[in-house]
Amino acid sequence: MKKQRTKKILKSIETIKKEIEKHFEKLEKEINEKEEIPARYHIKEIDKSLLNFLEKRLNLLKTDKSPVEQYKKRLNTLRQKADSQFN
């Protein structure tokens, strides 16, 4: 893979990670404020969109997928917290 292409992919990975962190911050805030609908939105956005995109980018570089696994564990913990709080 060309260096320039690799550099762009690495930059996009960092951007995705920042976006995931923003959604995690918002999710934690919504759970603490007992806002179910926005919290569910952030869970879905992280799970269905951002993590898939990150995983695809990591696959392109054939690198370690541990960041995706760490984010999934963190998301599952927050999802369980939300489920117990909203149900």
Predicted regions and their residues:
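Amphipathic coiled-coil alpha-helices
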Residues: 9, 16, 23, 39-42, ...
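Alpha-helical protein-protein interaction elements
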Residues: 1, 15-16, 33-34, 45, ...
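Alpha-helical oligomerization interfaces characterized by heptad or quasi-heptad repeats on one helix face
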Residues: 14, 21, 25-28, 51, ...
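Short, charge/polar-rich alpha-helical segments
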Residues: 1-21, 30-32
